[in-house]
């Protein structure tokens, strides 16, 4: 799989010598303030396709139902719901550099069991799967990258495009769109106002002298309800707050692409940065505390993240040259050597040699 090896070039592989049980793809519950579903660190299981409440067509129907005596009102297109099929990491990285926030699974499908990744069955194993995204109407699609526009959408927000509807109650319009598309179960109670999700992601590390709870620093947080998507980063104490408001219950994910310039990337399939699903939660946000017993996979990712974050920060504070940009760590608990396998930027890799060490992860 050519793209696999191209993505390995800028990588640093962290080989864990831990003898703990479990696997990088284990099912574990997460601990939050609210009762959030049990999620898995393996493939996402999709159900039926859902009606997108943010499509211009459905918002138009909601508008007619909410204001039956009002004249015809044109619903503006604020976003395109699209999907891309990058043929290699060059194309994938080009989209990422353009600020396209991509998910590897459809945003308008029922999720029967959440997980860390999805691979479209129509795409051969070993190739990059379809990447789903939301882009503005004036987005210039890069030449040569296959893409499809799936829907024209109206996503209410505090911006010029949505204010063109004048004195209409956009919160009520959004709720009505969910109701007429049979998605009312996503909504928060009407008594709860729209909220900017916020919270704290922490770990309890018994290897620390104080055995204290520490924040997971600098990781990207992703929240979405259908095509309404938002991202932010945690601060050094693990606190986060999204700038976008939600009236429905978002699905939350931690993306281990750290804001200081490194990522942690190895699921069952290789992706640029590991994603850890933490399930659907309140629109006010999720507080999550992880230890090695509650979720060993997520715990390992967080510990490595914090160690790398601290090193980058100490380099910056002391004038030491920081590691190369786009550094990637792989966490493998299947190797016995206590030394860390390191690969130089631009290294050429032998598939047989890699397979000897990481087995099924190279296939």
How would you describe each model-predicted region?
Residues 15-16:
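C-terminal motif of bacterial Sec signal peptides marking the signal peptidase cleavage site
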Residues 21-159:
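Long, solvent-exposed N-terminal ectodomains/accessory regions
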Residues 23-25, 178-209, 303-316:
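A short, Gly/Thr-enriched small/hydrophobic beta-strand-prone motif that recurs across taxa
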Residues 53-60, 197, 203-227:
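Short, ordered, surface-exposed loop/turn motifs in non-cytosolic proteins
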Residues 225-239:
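Short, acidic Ser/Thr/Gly-rich low-complexity loop/linker segments typical of extracellular
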Residues 232, 331-362:
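Catalytic zinc-binding patch centered on the HExxH motif and its immediate surroundings
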Residues 243-247, 259-261, 289-328, 341:
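Zn2+-dependent metallopeptidase catalytic core
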Residues 261-286:
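Structured interaction patches on ligand/partner-binding surfaces of diverse proteins
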């Amino acid at each position: 799989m050519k793209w696999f090896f191209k993505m390995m070039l800028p990588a640093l592989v962290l080989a864990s010598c831990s003898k703990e049980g479990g696997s990088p793809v284990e099912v574990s519950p997460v601990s939050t303030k609210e009762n959030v579903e049990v999620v898995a660190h393996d493939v996402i299981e999709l159900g039926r396709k859902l009606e997108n409440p943010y499509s211009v067509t459905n918002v138009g129907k909601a508008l007619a139902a909410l204001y039956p005596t009002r004249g015809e009102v044109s619903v503006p297109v604020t976003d395109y719901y699209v999907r891309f099929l990058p043929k290699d990491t060059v194309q994938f990285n080009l989209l990422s550099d353009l600020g396209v926030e991509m998910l590897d699974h459809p945003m308008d499908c029922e999720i029967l069991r959440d997980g860390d990744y999805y691979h479209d069955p129509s795409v051969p194993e070993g190739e990059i799967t379809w990447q789903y995204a939301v882009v503005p109407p004036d987005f210039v699609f890069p030449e040569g990258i296959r893409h499809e526009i799936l829907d024209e959408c109206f996503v209410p927000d505090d911006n010029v495009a949505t204010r063109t509807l004048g004195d209409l109650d956009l919160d009520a319009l959004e709720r009505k769109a969910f109701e007429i598309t049979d998605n009312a179960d996503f909504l928060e109670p009407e008594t709860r106002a729209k909220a900017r999700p916020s919270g704290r992601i922490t770990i309890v590390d018994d290897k620390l002298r104080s055995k204290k709870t520490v924040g997971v620093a600098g990781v990207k947080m992703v929240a979405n309800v259908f095509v309404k998507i938002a991202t932010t980063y945690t601060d050094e104490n693990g606190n986060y707050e999204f700038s976008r408001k939600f009236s429905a219950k978002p699905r939350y994910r931690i993306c281990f692409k750290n804001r200081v310039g490194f990522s942690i990337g190895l699921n069952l399939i290789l992706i640029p940065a590991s994603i850890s699903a933490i399930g659907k939660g309140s629109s006010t946000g999720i507080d999550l505390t992880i230890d090695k017993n509650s979720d060993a996979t997520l715990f390992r990712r967080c510990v490595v993240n914090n160690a790398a974050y601290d090193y980058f920060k100490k380099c910056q504070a002391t004038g030491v040259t920081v590691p190369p940009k786009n550094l990637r760590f792989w966490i493998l608990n299947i190797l016995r050597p206590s030394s860390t396998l390191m690969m130089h930027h631009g290294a050429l890799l032998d598939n047989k040699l890699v397979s000897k060490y990481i087995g099924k992860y190279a296939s």
